[in-house]
């Protein structure tokens, strides 16, 4: 009898266990919702801010087990929200990109950092971020993006490229090269939207704006009929090491953020290697790995993330003892096809080494021979300058011009030319009255905005700025819109 009851109990236990397995199996067969957000994932796995610390907390790791990554180290101070971050682990600088210990950053920000299978979860200021280690996707509270550079990992200590950290936390950054300090403010988009205050500038009074407003009604009928494209290119972007360019890249990032907020695409004509032989300056990113060039690379990453299109503007944009951006590089000043090919390949090599995506080529000062053009076409689909091989007056101003050589590459003119320093009002008036049957294609030197951008620091040590509404660029954008140009990207032509 006892044996019988024992048998019954064993049978019931087996049925019970089988039932649990069937339930678990049935759950595993339920298809996952591929549209789940990070918030859904957090709720599904109970990864709320209260429970994150119960998982594998990577902020409490023993750093003594850290194995050096074998990358060039650098001493730099990182400030976030007014506080210097304290690092026990090295800061790395690889190919002019900084890498910081993500574990220590989260610890410094009083956050939590946990790992669950193939995902990292970060809780910063009660905001949850996740990094999928399988596909390098970062999920933020308000966006999702792919890592620019892979995380570096040693014994569950993760290093993140500063460009990716900035993109994730939406940082506004100020780079102090004299003291090697990067001063940051989290959630910059919430902070820098208040950019409407005027910067006093005696050279540009409101009468210029008033004149433009008076002409607005006159341009309305013309703009409604205009179907032409508009193109904006920021010219001669490079790292000069000159004192007058101290705030150059910060101002450029402010400009890029403004353009992105206005949903206006723009182009960056980048000079990869700046040379100034008279001052013995040669900023070659292939041979130099430093704070100054790192800010340039960071800025190019930032602009790419903010609706910018990057292209090569020659290699050094100079020859002989001339300074980059001022000197010529090709054409009648250097007609050699061998030199041209060598420099083009060096420019491409530099961009590839720095992992900067390139979408067009612009020859310096539009000076190039027909034979050099034929070589350029082998490397680039978009040649962002007029096709003058049959004469300057033969360049197509109304549309991109298909190459007669390879029937593939496109040459793009700039009929609106550029805005000359000291003649800003005259140039803007010329553009306002331009022939709208031509492309609204113009190039612009970012330094013209310096007088309209004021950089500040508040009482808590947060970097801030004001960007005047009556700036040259903002007036240019207004004119292009009022003339009806549809501002686009060369990659969409």
Region annotations inferred by a language model:
Residues 212-302, 306, 350:
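Active-site beta->alpha N-cap acidic-glycine motif
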Residues 2-10:
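Sec-dependent signal peptide recognition
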Residues 21-23:
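Bacterial signal peptide processing site
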Residues 285-292, 358-451, 455:
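Active-site-adjacent pocket scaffolds in enzyme catalytic domains
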Residues 25-230:
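Primary recognition of N-terminal secretory signal peptides and signal-anchoring hydrophobic helices
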Residues 265-369, 439-442, 446, 455:
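Metal-dependent polysaccharide deacetylase catalytic core of the NodB/CE4 family, i.e.
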Residues 383-400, 447-493:
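C-terminal domain-boundary segment and adjacent tail
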Residues 16-19:
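C-terminal motif of bacterial Sec signal peptides marking the signal peptidase cleavage site
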């Amino acid at each position: 009898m006892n044996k019988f009851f024992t048998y019954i109990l064993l049978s019931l236990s087996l049925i019970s266990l089988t039932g649990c397995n069937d339930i678990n199996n049935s759950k595993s067969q339920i298809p996952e919702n591929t549209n789940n957000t990070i918030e859904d994932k957090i709720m599904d796995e109970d990864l709320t801010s209260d429970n994150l610390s119960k998982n594998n907390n990577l902020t409490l790791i023993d750093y003594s087990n850290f194995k050096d990554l074998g990358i060039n180290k650098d001493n730099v101070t990182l400030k976030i929200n007014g506080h210097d971050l304290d690092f026990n682990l090295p800061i790395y600088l690889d190919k002019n990109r900084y890498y910081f210990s993500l574990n220590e950053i989260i610890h410094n920000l009083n956050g939590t950092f946990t790992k669950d299978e193939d995902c990292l979860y970060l809780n910063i200021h009660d905001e949850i971020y996740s990094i999928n280690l399988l596909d390098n996707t970062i999920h933020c509270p308000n966006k999702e993006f792919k890592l620019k550079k892979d995380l570096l990992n040693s014994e569950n200590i993760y290093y993140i490229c500063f460009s990716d950290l900035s993109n994730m936390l939406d940082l506004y950054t100020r780079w102090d090269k004299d003291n090697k300090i990067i001063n940051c403010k989290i959630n910059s988009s919430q902070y820098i939207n208040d950019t409407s205050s005027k910067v006093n500038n005696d050279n540009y009074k409101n009468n210029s704006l008033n004149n433009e407003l008076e002409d607005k009604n006159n341009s309305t009928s013309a703009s409604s009929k205009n179907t032409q494209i508009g193109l904006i290119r920021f010219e001669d972007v490079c790292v000069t090491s000159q004192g007058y360019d101290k705030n150059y890249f910060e101002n450029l990032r402010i400009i890029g953020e403004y353009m992105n907020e206005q949903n206006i695409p723009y182009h960056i004509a980048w000079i990869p290697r700046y040379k100034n032989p008279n001052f013995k300056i040669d900023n070659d990113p292939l041979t130099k790995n430093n704070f100054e060039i790192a800010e340039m690379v960071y800025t190019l990453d930032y602009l790419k993330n903010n609706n910018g299109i990057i292209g090569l503007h020659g290699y050094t944009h100079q020859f002989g003892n001339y300074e980059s951006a001022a000197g010529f590089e090709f054409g009648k000043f250097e007609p050699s096809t061998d030199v041209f090919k060598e420099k083009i390949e060096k420019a491409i090599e530099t961009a590839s080494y720095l992992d900067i995506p390139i979408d067009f080529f612009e020859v310096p000062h539009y000076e190039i021979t027909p034979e050099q053009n034929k070589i350029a076409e082998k490397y680039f689909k978009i040649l962002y300058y007029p096709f003058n091989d049959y004469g300057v007056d033969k360049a197509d101003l109304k549309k991109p011009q298909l190459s007669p050589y390879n029937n593939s590459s496109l040459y793009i003119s700039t009929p609106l030319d550029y805005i000359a320093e000291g003649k800003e009002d005259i140039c803007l008036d010329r553009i306002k009255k331009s022939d709208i049957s031509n492309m609204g294609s113009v190039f612009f030197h970012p330094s013209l905005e310096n007088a309209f951008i004021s950089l500040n620091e508040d009482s808590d040590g947060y970097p801030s700025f004001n960007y005047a509404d009556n700036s040259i660029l903002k007036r240019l954008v207004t004119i292009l819109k009022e003339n009806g140009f549809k501002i686009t990207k060369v990659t969409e032509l």
